[in-house]
């Protein structure tokens, strides 16, 4: 029996039937959500497996020496990943050196110093930068930043920093305007809104009472930021920085426009060079055989690097609420 009749003669649904129907709906909902989560994990594993299979001819031919090989020559069918890997790491590192202080400063201004009527417009403007297509950054970098680097910035760097011992070697080379340093400037602008937005949100997690107590004790804004906000949010800040690093590691189009795509080791950061993503973008269309496998092996290296960086960032951001 699925229904009963009350004293007024109205049909009342059986509670057991309703309970069974709800359980079936919950079960279906659980299976759908489980399937969605499983699909995401399966796609991630599938990408990793496909990259590993396609990259296997490269590692079976060159072994692990592919990772530190310095020659990339399609005519000789010899390939090494080190120039592209170093170019990726160096350009990302320089971009972080530029973007992180600016991002933290902007986040401090938005959360501590900015007038209330300007806070939302400025925050929105910064977030809109994240929506600009990367190819636009590349075009602006090529037609605006490269001539500026060639005519003004690089000559000044070569005449000043280039004369210093040790570090000066990084700025001693012909300066066509394209190179790792130019790519780093473009990357720093691209990752700036990401780090700023995350840092601002992390700063907003500091309890208002903690802020007000610090100001009530006579602390200046600088002292509050240094002794209260940054220590309280340090893990979240690092997580946001790591997310920005993950974006910088995988950027393709903007870097391809301005890095120069020279597939050999360089001793100067102002010389044309290459990155993993730029190398793949420039060569993938015409590649076949071992060259194609080597490009996919570069993609596998980039996948592992990006996955590790983003996983660490998520872990650090997730721990923010515990401190």
PLM regions and their residue ranges:
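Membrane-interfacial helix termini and adjacent extracytoplasmic/periplasmic loops
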Residues: 61-79, 139-189
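Interhelical loop and adjacent transmembrane-helix boundary motif
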Residues: 255-303
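Transmembrane alpha-helical segments of polytopic membrane transport and secretion proteins
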Residues: 1-37, 313-323
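Transmembrane alpha-helices
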Residues: 124, 128, 132, 136, ...
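Periplasmic/extracellular loop-to-transmembrane helix junction in inner-membrane transport proteins
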Residues: 12-32, 51-95, 115-116, 173, ...
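C-terminal transmembrane helix and the adjacent membrane-cytosol boundary/short C-terminal tail
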Residues: 200-204, 208, 282-323
């Amino acid at each position: 029996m699925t229904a009963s009749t009350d004293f007024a003669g109205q049909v009342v649904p059986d509670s057991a039937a309703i309970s069974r129907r709800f359980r079936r709906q919950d079960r279906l909902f659980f299976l759908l959500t489980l399937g969605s989560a499983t699909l995401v994990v399966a796609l991630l594993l599938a990408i990793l497996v496909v990259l590993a299979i396609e990259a296997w001819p490269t590692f079976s031919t060159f072994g692990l020496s592919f990772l530190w090989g310095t020659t990339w020559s399609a005519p000789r069918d010899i390939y090494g990943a080190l120039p592209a890997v170093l170019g990726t790491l160096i350009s990302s590192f320089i971009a972080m050196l530029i973007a992180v202080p600016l991002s933290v400063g902007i986040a401090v201004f938005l959360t501590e110093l900015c007038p209330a009527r300007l806070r939302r417009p400025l925050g929105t403007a910064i977030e809109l930068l994240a929506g600009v297509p990367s190819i636009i950054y590349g075009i602006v970098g090529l037609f605006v930043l490269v001539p500026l680097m060639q005519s003004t910035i690089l000559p000044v760097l070569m005449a000043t920093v280039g004369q210093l011992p040790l570090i000066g070697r990084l700025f001693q080379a012909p300066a066509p305007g394209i190179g790792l340093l130019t790519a780093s400037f473009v990357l720093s602008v691209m990752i700036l809104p990401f780090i700023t937005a995350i840092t601002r949100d992390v700063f907003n997690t500091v309890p208002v009472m903690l802020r007000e107590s610090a100001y009530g004790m006579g602390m200046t804004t600088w002292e509050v930021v240094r002794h209260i906000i940054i220590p309280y949010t340090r893990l979240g800040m690092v997580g946001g920085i790591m997310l920005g690093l993950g974006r910088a590691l995988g950027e393709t189009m903007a870097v391809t426009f301005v890095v120069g795509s020279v597939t050999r080791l360089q001793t100067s950061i102002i010389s044309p060079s290459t990155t993993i993503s730029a190398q793949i973008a420039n060569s993938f269309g015409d590649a076949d055989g071992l060259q194609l496998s080597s490009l996919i092996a570069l993609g596998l290296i980039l996948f592992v690097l990006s996955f590790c960086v983003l996983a660490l960032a998520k872990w650090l951001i997730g721990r923010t609420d515990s401190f």
